[in-house]
């Protein structure tokens, strides 16, 4: 058997059925073996989109997503997508072609140091030097990617290794693999759990801060039981959105720079903060000196490197969130729980102050109104939102959705949180739809982010993948525009995108149905049509470019929420004639 065939067998042994990729010279043996395989390969139109799609697949399913590229520029094009997965602990297997082993280091055509390139942005990476290494390497890669704190793993595949022969009976795919030094701790220390339970039971103003680790661990049910048993309000990070139903009376919404008033004030006023599967990023804490200043902090995380990294923990617990929460609840049941009613009254008061105004009839459309109508349409189609997945891009579109859209289920709100990658949302939606074909998958994106991977319209058209793309079209890089208006004297530098393209015509040119929404009274009807069509569909929503969310200034206190300044766009664009004049003047000086 050839090495390339062994790679296919190894993928099949891991339960992989669908991969995303783009072929090239250094991966030709693999693609030749793929021809006779039952694996489904989705040909994206850019390697970055293959990585994002594999990431979206992983986030929606909880399984490892697989992306493939050739060597050199194919590998470099994967980098942004793999770095995105790494920042958000998403299990992606990235396969890259490589020049033959005897040419490595000779600057051969399309050679690049793939190991060095991927090392800082992967949980682990391998370069296979002999065909007989394939079975064990692939088993190890999937084990590492999907256990402990998940993350991407890269495998570099020299062309001669793919072409080489392997005796699969002599070198079978192992059921288990020995990984010296890799022993993720999944069960929390009993003494630490006992201490945490006592602190929670005696607390007067507890708050839970739930991060993406709750979703990764599958601990949403345990979180709900804990919150309801002790009556603890729950706020989430962006990555934790969906781990706790946001229509629950104890739900506070997202905390941080773009968080809700209820969440930010509750964290600031609490006396015990139970942080689960979160890394206390700067966007969550603001000024650390004033973050939960009166609270004892319990920090639960499977990665010991996160404990104490950004915020000091009074009771650190290293372990899998599901296991720790189960044991914590068992310990609490045996204790007398102090009454929390006074605190809950304060929480409900904060929640009343946080109710947003969303029912705007303005034109251009306010994003809040679109999100409100989207929620109503989706709840009508899927009342518990069990079969709905939202992906967002990065920028204002992400924050409007995080702030206003009430998520009810884990793995139903997919966003690039750590790296903040524009261009993530649309290809991630492709991966999510492939992973969950019966879910309604809606890609919410800004016009800037959409244009970074708009070529994937060809992919959804070619494979008939019924994703609904909703573009928040304000012809502006909205988040940068908002910051420039707030912090840079309204000097709007390079944030206006101009009038092209016509997104409806662009989609139609790829064979994708499309429509434009310019009035609030069109939103529901056109959304329903798009979602129920079960076809690839693009909606171009013309929104108010000057609309912005309140926010906490960078490095500010969570309670220092600044109202945005409404500033109309001041478009300043040099035309090509001006550019030519500048170049002509430079040429005269050189002469």
Curated annotation (Swiss-Prot):
- Entry protein name: Probable acetolactate synthase large subunit
What keywords were assigned to this record?
Amino-acid biosynthesis, Branched-chain amino acid biosynthesis, FAD, Flavoprotein, Magnesium, Metal-binding, Thiamine pyrophosphate, Transferase
Enzyme Commission no: 2.2.1.6
Question: Which intervals of the chain are annotated as region Thiamine pyrophosphate binding?
Answer: 396-476
Q: Which GO terms describe its biological process?
A: isoleucine biosynthetic process; L-valine biosynthetic process; sulfur compound biosynthetic process
Name what cofactor the protein needs. Mg(2+); thiamine diphosphate
UniProt catalytic activity? 2 pyruvate + H(+) = (2S)-2-acetolactate + CO2
The record's listing under PANTHER family reads: ACETOLACTATE SYNTHASE CATALYTIC SUBUNIT, MITOCHONDRIAL (PTHR18968:SF13), THIAMINE PYROPHOSPHATE ENZYMES (PTHR18968)
GO molecular-function annotation terms? acetolactate synthase activity; flavin adenine dinucleotide binding; magnesium ion binding; thiamine pyrophosphate binding
Which residues fall in a coiled-coil region? none
> What pathway annotation does it carry?
Amino-acid biosynthesis; L-isoleucine biosynthesis; L-isoleucine from 2-oxobutanoate: step 1/4; Amino-acid biosynthesis; L-valine biosynthesis; L-valine from pyruvate: step 1/4
Question: What's the record's note on cofactor binding?
Answer: Binds 1 Mg(2+) ion per subunit. Binds 1 thiamine pyrophosphate per subunit.
InterPro entries in UniProt: Acetolactate_synth_lsu (IPR012846), AHAS_TPP (IPR039368), DHS-like_NAD/FAD-binding_dom (IPR029035), THDP-binding (IPR029061), Thiamin_PyroP_enz_cen_dom (IPR012000), Thiamin_PyroP_enz_TPP-bd_dom (IPR012001), TPP-bd_CS (IPR000399), TPP_enz (IPR045229)
Entry similarity comment: Belongs to the TPP enzyme family.
Q: Where does Mg(2+) bind?
A: 447, 474
Quaternary state and partners of this protein? Dimer of large and small chains.
Instruction: Tell me which residues bind FAD.
Output: 149, 258-279, 301-320
GO terms for cellular component:
acetolactate synthase complex
Per UniProt, thiamine diphosphate binds at 47
């Amino acid at each position: 058997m050839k090495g390339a065939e062994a790679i296919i067998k190894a993928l099949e042994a891991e339960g992989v059925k669908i991969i995303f990729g783009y072929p090239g010279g250094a991966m030709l043996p693999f693609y030749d073996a793929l021809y006779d395989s039952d694996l489904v390969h989705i040909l994206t139109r850019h390697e970055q989109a293959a990585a994002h799609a594999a990431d979206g697949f992983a986030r929606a399913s909880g399984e490892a997503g697989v992306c493939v590229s050739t060597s050199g520029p194919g590998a470099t094009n994967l980098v942004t997508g793999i770095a995105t997965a790494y920042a958000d602990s998403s299990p992606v297997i990235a396969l890259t072609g490589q020049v033959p082993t005897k040419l490595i280091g000779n600057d051969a055509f399309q050679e690049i140091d793939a190991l060095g390139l991927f090392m800082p942005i992967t949980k682990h990476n391998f370069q296979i030097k002999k065909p007989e290494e394939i079975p064990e390497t692939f088993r190890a890669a999937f084990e590492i990617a999907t256990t402990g704190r998940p993350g991407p793993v890269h495998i570099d595949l020299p062309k001669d290794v793919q072409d080489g022969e392997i005796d699969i009976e002599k070198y079978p795919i192992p059921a288990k693999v020995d990984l010296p030094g890799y022993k993720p701790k999944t069960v929390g220390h009993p003494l630490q759990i006992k201490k945490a339970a006592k602190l929670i039971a005696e607390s007067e103003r507890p708050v839970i801060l739930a991060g993406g680790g709750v979703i990764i661990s599958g601990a949403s049910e345990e979180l709900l039981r804990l919150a309801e048993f002790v009556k603890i309000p729950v706020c989430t990070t962006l990555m934790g959105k969906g781990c706790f139903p946001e229509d629950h009376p104890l739900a506070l919404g997202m905390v941080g720079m773009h968080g809700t008033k209820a969440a930010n004030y509750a964290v600031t006023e609490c006396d015990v903060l139970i942080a689960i599967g979160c890394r206390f990023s700067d966007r969550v804490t603001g000024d650390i000196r004033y973050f939960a200043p009166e609270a004892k902090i319990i920090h639960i995380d499977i990665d010991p490197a996160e404990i104490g990294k950004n915020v000091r923990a009074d009771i650190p617990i290293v372990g899998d969130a599901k296991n720790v929460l189960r044991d914590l609840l068992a310990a609490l049941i045996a204790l007398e729980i102090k009454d929390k009613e006074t605190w809950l009254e304060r929480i409900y008061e904060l929640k009343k102050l946080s109710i947003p105004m969303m029912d705007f009839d303005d034109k251009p459309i306010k994003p809040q109104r679109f999100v409100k109508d989207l929620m109503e349409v989706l709840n009508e189609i899927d009342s518990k939102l069990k079969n709905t997945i939202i992906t967002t891009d990065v920028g204002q579109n992400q924050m409007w959705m995080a702030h206003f859209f009430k998520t009810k289920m884990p793995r139903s709100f997919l966003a690039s949180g750590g790296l903040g990658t524009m261009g993530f949302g649309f290809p991630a939606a492709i991966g999510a739809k492939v992973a969950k074909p019966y879910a309604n998958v809606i890609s919410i994106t800004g016009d800037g982010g959409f244009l970074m991977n708009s070529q994937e319209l060809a992919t959804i058209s070619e494979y008939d993948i019924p994703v609904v793309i909703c573009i928040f079209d304000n012809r502006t890089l909205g988040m940068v525009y908002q910051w420039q208006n707030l912090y840079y004297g309204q000097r709007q530098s390079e944030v206006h995108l101009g009038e092209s393209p016509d997104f409806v015509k662009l989609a139609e040119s790829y064979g994708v149905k499309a429509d434009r929404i310019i009035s609030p009274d069109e939103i529901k009807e056109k959304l329903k049509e798009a979602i129920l069509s079960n076809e690839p569909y693009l909606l171009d929503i013309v929104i108010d470019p000057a609309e912005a969310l309140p926010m906490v200034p960078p490095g500010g206190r969570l309670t220092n929420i600044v109202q945005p300044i409404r500033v109309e766009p001041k478009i300043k664009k040099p035309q090509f004639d001006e550019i030519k004049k500048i170049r002509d003047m430079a040429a005269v000086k050189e002469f």
